[in-house]
């Protein structure tokens, strides 16, 4: 299913500028997993910081603010994996509530396992998150499935979520992933509705799909997602597009045999975790994690 109208927000790496530098040089050092919210005449950006396996993995989630959406100052908040009692942190989800308060959803790895869970904390401002006050909102199942990287929106009076699921029953299959869709009246109690997007045999996304950003437009839904063809491409996923009229039934737009819609020009080609934030005045800013020439991952941005 081809639809060039859905390419409007695809990353163009040549137009990207650096937003957050990785915490070191070389493979395994990442700044990325962005979640952006336009507020207070600027952009709040939540992101994950990571070191290589054996050197800390996903060691912190930070939140920073920039008036221009590009030049972020020192973080207004930093949450460490030690504070969360987790082996590693992944992409956060920052949400502003209708009453002006804020929520931060955190993906947490259970030590010694492949299991992931999602916890949530709430505060009056992004600088005031206190993770001593938090709850598990998506527990997963330590023997059956890991749940992480939720993408959450409020639309038409309902909460929508697309979360990444990894199967755990077979140790050789835990790198596989699908995106499952859920709804909620409050963003806390979720009801799973089904598989929104899964890999296609023989295609560039055959090993797994992870929805990263979603846009509603009337009766249609467009999702930008990360995909990989093999376990070897873990950490170097690339970006594709899926569409549908139902948020639980998305169809990839790339033709059979075609590659991803966007990738890094460097090394493994990783270009993932795209996030879109609409700005006052009608423009949109893109944030995404992209592999650099030295193998590290930087958080970059574009303005459309």
Sequence positions of predicted segments:
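Peripheral membrane lipid-binding modules
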Residues: 91
């Amino acid at each position: 299913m081809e639809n060039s109208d859905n390419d409007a927000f695809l990353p163009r790496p040549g137009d990207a500028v650096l937003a957050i530098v990785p915490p070191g040089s070389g493979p395994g050092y990442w700044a990325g997993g962005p979640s952006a919210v336009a507020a207070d005449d600027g952009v709040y950006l939540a992101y994950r910081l990571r070191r290589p396996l054996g050197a800390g993995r996903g060691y912190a989630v930070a939140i920073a603010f920039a008036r221009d959406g590009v030049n972020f100052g020192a973080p207004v908040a930093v949450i460490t994996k030690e504070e969360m009692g987790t082996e590693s942190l992944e992409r956060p989800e920052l949400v502003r509530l209708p009453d002006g308060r804020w929520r931060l959803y955190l993906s947490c790895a259970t030590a010694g396992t492949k299991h992931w869970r999602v916890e949530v904390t709430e505060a009056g401002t992004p600088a005031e998150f206190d993770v001593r006050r938090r709850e598990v909102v998506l527990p997963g199942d330590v023997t059956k499935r890991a749940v992480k990287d939720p993408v959450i929106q409020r639309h038409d009076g309902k909460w929508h979520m697309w979360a990444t699921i990894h199967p755990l029953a077979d140790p050789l299959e835990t790198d596989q992933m699908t995106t499952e869709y859920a709804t909620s009246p409050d963003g806390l109690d979720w009801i799973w509705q089904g598989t929104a997007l899964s890999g296609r045999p023989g295609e560039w996304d055959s090993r797994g799909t992870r929805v990263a950003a979603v846009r509603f437009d009337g009766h249609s839904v467009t999702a930008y997602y990360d995909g990989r063809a093999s376990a070897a491409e873990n950490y170097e996923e690339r970006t594709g597009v899926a569409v549908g009229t139902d948020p639980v039934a998305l169809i990839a737009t790339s033709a059979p045999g075609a590659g991803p819609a966007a990738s890094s020009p460097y090394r493994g080609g990783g270009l993932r975790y795209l996030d879109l934030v609409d700005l006052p005045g009608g423009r949109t800013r893109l944030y995404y994690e992209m592999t650099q020439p030295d193998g590290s991952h930087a958080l970059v941005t574009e303005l459309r």
